[in-house]
Structure formats: structure tokens, C-alpha cells
């Protein structure tokens, strides 16, 4: 059975490679080869992993590779079909309907992804037992391109899952569909937590013979994941972590906005699933799109433009149609050097363009006119092109621009800023990720300036000798029983931080000693903490031996 | 000159206002406190930031538990602290000289 699976897998890979070769599509073939090699690498790594977190990263890579291979396969099949159909139905070149206008491509970028969680546990502060953790990441697909975010560890202290990545898709059309899938896996071993569904699989595995049965079970279980067919790409690892699809959604042009928006998530798993996370049900993100017609020039050439008020004197300019403007530069070089154009004519959704019989009266052929409405005034610019062909190509460029604007809609109102994502750093030793509180560093230095300003205004007296209150800081007891006011541990801590044992927000907590498991306060001294309240504030007879610290 | 606990003290303080953060159903401040009149100050790994008042309540003579309770009242969303630290004195001196 095992051998058969091997053979099937090899045959499938062979088939994939042959398809790519026969299509002579070197780009896609190269990408496919690359993914297949990455997949082999990920399988080997997974087999060699000892730590759970390494295994999670390797499984994630495997899942991404599998998804990519399948999507490239799908693309190959589509192209093959198109090729075959193209060959069989021959169209005469000079008849048939003109090619349909297709909209320009654009860059689509999704960033600042945040998925809110909804913990219902009212026992939050009394964390019982170990902190349950999950590893999650997002898989994003647009067309045949698949990209993934980094993997994040989630536990009860997080209010949202926030991904730092920017994901950019370079060749999207205005009819794009960006599919977003959230995958999760338990960081702890699943065995302890699952129950029912495994029993059937165990039965199956034991009846097929242990090793091959385990393989089949692993592949059957992973079939619920990225939709990979189990026989085509069986998961080689046994007992490794398994990612489950937790939620998904599809975003289209309507969701694009130069700002944050919240979208609904379709939840895909239920509470029995070991990787189930309490998702609030929405995802916030910034989805921006930059159609190429806005960022790249679509036409350029020599034009003669009628100067304002001068009927006969037409200036020769170098026109560049870019975005929603026609820039008229004095010289062709000015466009590159950043010189200001002589004239800028707006070309947007409201603009009307006409090829010109209008100016036959002036005796100038091959003209076109561009009219814009500014309030109550209509401003018309008349431009003369060099020849009939030039006029046709300018008109064509303008019609294409109008078409693109009608397709890309709100993306053409203003250019949306897209940052090229920085190359992602390889996953380092996975530290426990904290919540917002990790970033909170209260900087006292700024406030000191304000304080001293106030003091200089009010007091004015010179303080040369150290004032008596500073003695509080010298730790020299005046009485035999040393007592001091409650100290606040500063938020920005020195280098040594130890994670709290029971998952309270991990502030820069100042544990000098490995903590014990008492719920709220930790005792530094070996003696049990003296918790009896002393309302009078007088120190007790025996010397206090402890230094308690509590998070608030 | 030394500080005698139980005696009134005049000190340069800094007023700090903190809005508590919402974490699930609870409001937390996000830092830890240590010490108290019932604690041994010689074991304090830090010597900064002593709290004199919390939302009007005197903190110069409180136990660790009382301090913690005053800071974690569920009904209060904002905590106003009067805090003193050694470096305040230096800062004041520097500003006087300049």
C-alpha cells in the first residue's frame, strides 16, 4: 500500500511536469518546479523536526506549497484548454468582431490585517491550568497567486490576531477575487484534546496496516484543509501538527478603500475542532488598489495646443497621458526631469473628449478637444496631433483610459498609496507573543520637562542641599523596622523579563526569581508571604522578609 | 537626615494619569507594583518610582495588599497617581541651574 502511494505520488508529479513542458510555458513551469522542490524540502524538514514550533512552521510551508502547486496546476489546465480550443476553431484574421477592450492591470495590496477574538471566559484572571495556545496564519489567493502571512501564536491574553505583513499582488484585474483563509493549529499536542473524530481514523489505520494506514489517515484528515486532494499530495508526516481552516472570506473591488474597513468572515470550523478559536466574525484590513493607468503613462507624443486667448498661435508641446491628467511639457525631457509642465489638462470621469470636426473652420486637421466642467464654466482645450494615425492612437488611449476608469471605479479617484512589502525575515525562535501591553512603555523623561517647567515658575528657590524626602530612596532605615511606601515597578523594564506562569498580560514584569504558581502575587523570599493587613500601617514586631510584586 | 516612616513628608512629585485598558471583561493597568509598608525594602531590585497617592488615597503607609486593591478597583477607569522618584530631584536642580 505504501509503495502504491509512492508510485501514485510520483506519477502525479510526473504528470504535472509533463503538462508544464508541453505547454512550453516557461514561467509557470519554473514556478511549478520551484514549488515542488520547496515541498520536498518542507517534507524533509518536517520529518526531522523535534520541536513543536519548528514543526508548525514546516507544516505551514507544506500547506502553502501544496496550495500553490494545485493552483498552478489549475492554471496550466486552463491554458492548455484555451490553447487546444484556439487551435481547433480558426478565425479568419480580417473578419470577426474586434477584440474586446480589456481593462488595465493593477496592483492590489492588503495590509494591517486584524482579526478580533471574543473570549467569553469570565474566569480570565484566574487562569486554570496551562495556557492554551494556537498557531495561526492567513493564506491569501488572487488568481493563481498564493501568498501567506507570518505565523502568529495566539493565546487568551490577545484581544486580536494582528498580522504585520503587507501582501501585494501585482497583476490583478478590476474583477479580482481575493480569497482570504485563516488556518489554525494547536501548539500543544492534539492527542490530549481530541476525541471522537479520531476514533474512526484509528480504526481505519489499524485495519490497513499501521504505517500505510497512518499515511492514509493523515492525508484524509488534511483533506479538510486547503482542499488538496488526498491522493495527489499526501501529507508525509505522521503525528505532526495539523492546520484546520478556521474562517474564510472573499474580497473584491467593492471592498477597496484607502483606509480601514471591516469585513465579515465566514466561520468554517466549530467548537469540536481542536483548533477552534473564538473568532468575533470579522476581519479588519486596508485593501488598496493601484491601477496601472494611474501610475504609468499610457500615451505620449507631440501635440500642438491652442494657447489661451490666442487664436492663431499654437504651442508645440510634448504630451504625456498619465493617470487622470494630460501633462503638456515644453520638451520631452521635462517629463523625466520633473520639470513643471506648461499645461495640465484633467482627464477624468466627467471629461468629454471629441475628435475634431470642431476646428475645421480654423483649417487645422487632426484635432481633438477635451472639455471639463468647472462649476458653471466649461473649459475646452483643443489639441492638434501630427497625423491621422497619431489622432487615432491618442483617441484610442483616451477611450482605454475612460474604460479603465469605469472598471476600476473608486480606485481612480486618487492614487492609493501602496508600500512595497519588505522581504519577510525568516521565522526566528518563536518568543511568546504578547499583547498590546508589550508595546506600552511609559516614557517619564518627557514628563520631567513639564514638571521642571512648572517648578521653575512656582518655586524659583535654589535647591542645593538634597531635600529630606530623597532619603526614601537611600534604603537606609531610620527605625529598626524598615518600611517604605509602596513602590511602583516602572513599565520599561531592564533586560531580564520572565514570562508570567499563568498568562496575565505580559508586561515588563520585574521578576527577579523564577516564579511559583501562586495566582496573584509572587514572593521573592523563601518564607511564605505575610499577607495579614496592618491597617495602622505600623510595622509588625518581626522584620518583614518579603518583597511582593503584583500585576495590576 | 533620613526619612522616618509615619511622619509627614514633603516631596517633589509627578502627577501621572493612567486610563485603564480593557482586557476581556476586566480593566487593567498593565504594570506591576512591588513593596508596601509590610514589605522589606532592602529586597527591592529597583529604587525608582514611589507612589504617594492613588486617586486621592494616601499610599505612603499602605501594605502591599492595600496598594494593590486601591489600584485595581473595578469601578474606576482612570487612575491618577502622584509619583516621586530620585531623578526628579536631579531634573529640578538642573532646571534651576540653567
Swiss-Prot record, chain B:
<keyword id="KW-1003">Cell membrane</keyword>
<dbReference type="GO" id="GO:0030178">
    <property type="term" value="P:negative regulation of Wnt signaling pathway"/>
</dbReference>
<dbReference type="InterPro" id="IPR036034">
    <property type="entry name" value="PDZ_sf"/>
</dbReference>
<feature type="domain" description="PDZ">
    <location>
        <begin position="12"/>
        <end position="87"/>
    </location>
</feature>
<dbReference type="GO" id="GO:2000009">
    <property type="term" value="P:negative regulation of protein localization to cell surface"/>
</dbReference>
<comment type="subunit">
    <text>Interacts (via its PDZ domain) with GLS2. Interacts (via its PDZ domain) with RTKN (via the C-terminal region); this interaction facilitates Rho-mediated activation of the FOS serum response element (SRE). Interacts (via PDZ domain) with ARHGEF16. Interacts (via PDZ domain) with KCNJ4 (via C-terminus). Competes with LIN7A for KCNJ4 binding. Interacts (via its PDZ domain) with CTNNB1; this interaction inhibits the transcriptional activity of CTNNB1. Interacts with ADGRB2.</text>
</comment>
<keyword id="KW-0963">Cytoplasm</keyword>
<keyword id="KW-0007">Acetylation</keyword>
<dbReference type="GO" id="GO:0005634">
    <property type="term" value="C:nucleus"/>
</dbReference>
<keyword id="KW-0539">Nucleus</keyword>
<dbReference type="GO" id="GO:0005886">
    <property type="term" value="C:plasma membrane"/>
</dbReference>
<dbReference type="GO" id="GO:0007266">
    <property type="term" value="P:Rho protein signal transduction"/>
</dbReference>
<keyword id="KW-0879">Wnt signaling pathway</keyword>
<comment type="function">
    <text>May regulate a number of protein-protein interactions by competing for PDZ domain binding sites. Binds CTNNB1 and may thereby act as an inhibitor of the Wnt signaling pathway. Competes with LIN7A for KCNJ4 binding, and thereby promotes KCNJ4 internalization. May play a role in the Rho signaling pathway.</text>
</comment>
<feature type="modified residue" description="N-acetylserine">
    <location>
        <position position="2"/>
    </location>
</feature>
<dbReference type="GO" id="GO:0008013">
    <property type="term" value="F:beta-catenin binding"/>
</dbReference>
<dbReference type="GO" id="GO:0005737">
    <property type="term" value="C:cytoplasm"/>
</dbReference>
<dbReference type="GO" id="GO:0016055">
    <property type="term" value="P:Wnt signaling pathway"/>
</dbReference>
<protein>
    <recommendedName>
        <fullName>Tax1-binding protein 3</fullName>
    </recommendedName>
</protein>
<keyword id="KW-0472">Membrane</keyword>
<dbReference type="GO" id="GO:0008285">
    <property type="term" value="P:negative regulation of cell population proliferation"/>
</dbReference>
